[in-house]
A protein has these predicted regions:
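Core catalytic machinery and nucleic-acid-binding channels of phosphodiester-processing enzymes
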Residues: 345
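Generic signal for short, ordered secondary-structure residues
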Residues: 84-91, 116, 325, 332, ...
Length: 619
């Protein structure tokens, strides 16, 4: 039945079948040419998880005997590098008049970081990136999300590098003509989202999960490609079923009735005309009330005056450019899509450590004690605590001895430790960086210097992380500019510690050029804030504030104004109960000011009374 249904679909939709065949061919070709790297990813993951398999020099052959004892130095050194901080956005305006908009973008992105699960995404990528050499962000606009007053919101997820198949021969995502992603989805989800029944389809790529085949899952493959106009198109399928085909994926899409052309309202199943078939069409423009400047003659003044009126104009929707897939590299590597993997860098040392660890373990376990007895003398071989040996005379007793046989593991331990140190040196990790005792650093300053040296070795990884987040923030802004029809609430903190409630409204970015034509202003520089890592470490910020207080940076110690500035800073750093303490100090300051004013008024009155002429005659 399944074969018959597929055959009928091919007969009914020859053009759709032709397009499906074309994309499936491109996908299979790209996957075949990427196969070696996909296999390498599986081995890298096995190393990180502490596989006991012993690989040959070419990484393909596996020894028949497994390691008996694995010291997983790859796991240890990768976990030592984990940075839980998320780089926060920094937006700079190119034009002076856009500085306020740049601040609003920055606050909007900070809100999105807090609400979209960036901490969980970063925590996952901190392991995937060094293991595989890179990882991918996927940015989408989800109309099912939002608040009571808004429809839709950004959706940010991570795609494992094994689930991204690039165009063969191209190592820059932005320069690719097409790129594939593959995901495992339930059949029910596919039917609900795309309206296609895939209940009879099989899972084609179970290796993107754990390799086990599930009857409830299917593999959904998505091709993002550059269309003829330079935009981004999308073709998505599952086995022999086309799920989506959009020539201009990032343009506004509306669903209309195939029969009468009426716009579909929500998720209605049947049109008013009776048709149940819907199709997607591009919605290119929207009507927006805009200011219009005109020059008119004023008969009262006899001069021409500029008048501003409102008129409704058709404005093209803003459309993002570029793939919604953003690569975060570990360390740049020439002629490769992904960066250098830490696993590949120290694989030889891990193999040696596995072999030596197993050898030491075997030596220790096979060593033991042997009893030397005269010929013919028997002993009790029981588990009793006290055993009896019967000898004929003292001479026979003198022949009884115990020989302890224990292999020397000193050299093995020395070589194992050398390989461990080589691995650490390769990645630029010191004992101080790991939080271990470092005998080479004799003072706190020396230890901090040692940590800074290690941090310098890892600076490239931080630069690549910041670059990926900068690009992600730029794409997030562009998606909001394109699809956020309702103003999105933005919460931020003012300099005095109070909360500021505003909105991100995309229409604020609609400008008119010198020719009178409307355009969307997206000319901003997106970076990451270099101080965000320190700001995440609240305890360090608290300690810094304490040091500044003692040094007199806030003012004279003991003065209420000094205390107010100090606790204002601690409140910004989220110090517990800092806000309550600050309010108490504010009350004391107010009381102090009232007392000073009262004392000043009293002094003025006394001065006024003392300066009046004496009306009484002298006695």
């Amino acid at each position: 039945m399944n074969w018959l249904r597929r055959t009928m679909e091919k007969i009914k939709n020859p053009e759709e079948n032709k397009e499906l065949k074309r994309w499936k061919g491109k996908y299979e070709d790209a996957k075949t040419k990427y196969d070696e790297i996909l296999k390498d990813m599986e081995i890298n993951e096995a190393y990180y998880e502490g596989s006991k398999s012993i690989y040959g020099p070419n990484k393909t052959s596996v020894a028949p005997k497994q390691a008996g004892n694995v010291r997983n130095i790859i796991y240890e050194l990768i976990e030592s590098q984990v940075d839980t901080s998320v780089p926060m956005p920094k937006v700079t305006a190119i034009h002076a008049e856009d500085e306020e908009l740049a601040t609003k973008i920055e606050k909007f992105l900070e809100n999105e970081v807090r609400t979209l699960g960036f901490k969980q995404i970063n925590d996952l990528q901190e392991r995937i990136v060094p293991v595989q050499g890179g990882d991918f962000f996927l940015i989408e606009w989800d109309n099912t999300k939002g608040t009571h007053c808004t429809i839709g919101d950004l959706s940010i997820s991570t795609i494992h590098p094994r689930n991204v198949i690039p165009q063969p021969g191209v190592v820059d995502v932005d320069k690719m003509d097409y790129i594939f992603t593959r995901t495992a989805q339930t059949k029910e989800y596919v039917k609900l989202r795309f309206g296609k029944d895939v209940s009879m389809e099989d899972e084609t790529d179970p290796e993107i999960r754990d390799g086990s085949v599930s009857e409830d899952l299917v593999t959904v493959i998505t091709a993002y490609y550059k269309n003829k106009d330079g935009g981004i198109g999308l073709y998505r399928w599952c086995n022999d079923v086309t799920l989506e085909d959009m020539e201009d994926y990032q343009s506004r899409q509306i669903e209309v009735c195939e029969k009468c052309g009426r716009t579909r309202m929500g998720r209605e199943e049947q049109c008013e005309c009776g048709s149940k078939k819907w199709k997607k069409e591009t919605d290119a423009t929207e009507k927006i009330m805009m200011a219009k400047m005109t020059v008119a003659f004023n008969p009262l003044t006899g001069e021409e005056e500029v008048q501003q009126t409102q008129e409704e104009r058709d404005v093209e929707y803003y459309k993002p450019t570029g793939y919604p897939i953003i690569l975060r590299k570990n360390i740049s590597k020439d002629r490769y899509l992904l960066g250098t993997s830490d696993v590949n860098a120290i694989r030889d040392q891990q193999e040696t450590v596995k072999k030596l660890g197993s050898k030491i373990n075997e030596k220790l376990l096979k060593g033991g004690s042997y009893a030397v007895l005269p010929e013919g003398l028997g002993i009790e071989l029981t588990d009793d605590e006290l055993k009896i040996i019967r000898v004929k005379d003292p001479a026979q007793r003198a022949l009884i001895d115990v020989i302890t046989v224990q292999a020397d593991c000193t050299q093995d331990r020395m070589v194992l430790e050398e390989n461990y140190q080589w691995a650490k040196s390769t990645l630029g990790i010191t004992d101080s960086f790991q939080g271990k005792y470092d005998s080479s650093a004799l003072s706190g300053t020396a230890k901090q210097y040692s940590i800074n040296q290690a941090a310098g070795r890892l600076e490239s990884k931080r630069i690549m992380k910041n670059a990926a987040y900068s690009k992600l923030y730029e794409m997030m802004f562009k998606f909001a500019l394109a699809y956020a029809d309702q103003p999105m609430p933005v919460i931020s903190q003012n300099t005095d510690g109070s909360m500021n409630y505003a909105h991100f409204d995309r229409k604020e970015f609609l400008k008119i050029d010198d020719a009178g034509e409307p355009y969307w202003d997206d000319e901003f520089i997106f970076e990451t804030d270099p101080t965000s890592t320190l700001m995440v470490n609240r305890e360090a910020m608290w300690n810094q504030a304490d040091m500044k207080l003692q040094s007199g940076a806030f003012g004279v110690l003991g003065d209420l104004k000094t205390a107010y500035l100090y606790w204002l800073e601690q409140e910004r750093n989220d110090y517990p109960h800092a806000g309550e303490i600050k309010r108490v100090i504010e009350e004391r300051l107010a009381e102090q000011q009232q007392q000073e004013q009262a004392a000043q008024m009293q002094a003025e009155q006394m001065q006024a009374m003392g300066g009046m002429p004496n009306a009484m005659p002298g006695m």
